[in-house]
Swiss-Prot record:
The gene is recF. The RecF protein is involved in DNA metabolism; it is required for DNA replication and normal SOS inducibility. RecF binds preferentially to single-stranded, linear DNA. It also seems to bind ATP. The keyword Cytoplasm applies. Pfam families: SMC_N. This is DNA replication and repair protein RecF. It is found in: Cytoplasm. InterPro entries: DNA-binding_RecF (IPR001238), DNA-binding_RecF_CS (IPR018078), P-loop_NTPase (IPR027417), RecF/RecN/SMC_N (IPR003395), RecF_2 (IPR042174). NCBIfam families: recf. The keyword DNA repair applies. It comes from the Bacteria. PROSITE patterns: RECF_1, RECF_2. PANTHER family: DNA REPLICATION AND REPAIR PROTEIN RECF (PTHR32182:SF0). GO terms for biological process: DNA replication; DNA synthesis involved in DNA repair; double-strand break repair; SOS response.
Amino acid sequence: MAIARLIVENFRNISAVDLEFDHGFNFLVGNNGSGKTSLLEALFYLGHGRSFKSSVTTRVIRYDQPHFTLHGRIRELQHEWSVGLQKQRKDGNTIVKINGEDGNKISDLAHLLPMQIITPEGLTLLNGGPSYRRAFLDWGLFHHQPNFHSAWSALHRLLKQRNAALNQTYDYNMLKPWDMELAKLAHQVSQWRADYAEALSPEIEQTCRLFLPELDIHVSFHQGWEKDTDYAQLLTENFERDKAIGYTVSGPQKADFRFKSNGLPVEDVLSRGQLKLLMCALRLAQGEHLMAQKNRHCIFLIDDFASELDETKRALLAQRLQNSNSQVFVTAISPEQLKQMQPEKHRTFQVVNGQIEQLL
């Protein structure tokens, strides 16, 4: 999978650009604030329907414009798609088009464009709350298990309804029919997560040994309640407690994917540089797992490539990315920061105040 062409209009400080990319490496070079991260953000938005920097739509749309528009041409093997996304300032409405047809969902775009992003802020995958690590697992399942997205959506809808009902009823029999359905979905989603975590864990640990040979990294999945406990029974037993607190305490919404080094949480013992390498290892292992299992290449977006990595580690990451045969977008302040990442075929773009030009 690769983005062959991207048109961006009125996205942050980018008024209008029309760019053609290499199917391998694409370098975005410019000073801080020039717009290189904004281009990565536009690429991410096209593949996720949201920003990785802000949840406020008005901050993404260029200050004096009613909307932003993204158009892309995507290629995979012998297939090609045109995709488009427009976000309105006034009502926040999102329009998604695939091959010129309306009525598509953001999830349709996400399926077409499997993306991994590595940013300085991405350490929340390791030192943030469990929700970041659930999202990591669920990204993989979205691309590996065709029924996961619908089951996940139904699960969250039922949890929301149950939490609302907890504040309105004193009789558990009113909740029991919902809880039976909730328990079924919880077991299915948790089993998918457990199976995926089990399949991915050896690849993560192997990649960690390459990037961080001085450390012994182990991963483990926790489903959100005791492993051998029946979830339907647990919901019944916890009704009074859940009602007192106002929400469902246990369940797949509390799942976690934990990382430890020598028996201790990695966020407590690793330096920021080591955490960044571990984050890179996780993203790479997940992208490579997708390729191995589904024969689909992931697109990698890397912001501030040189940050907190020495030259040896930069070269190691660059070589692993080259070996993946994936499309890669990398930002840097200067070309010198990219000298470890110079494949024979690549494209370099200079970014200045929202203007982007390819360097020959």
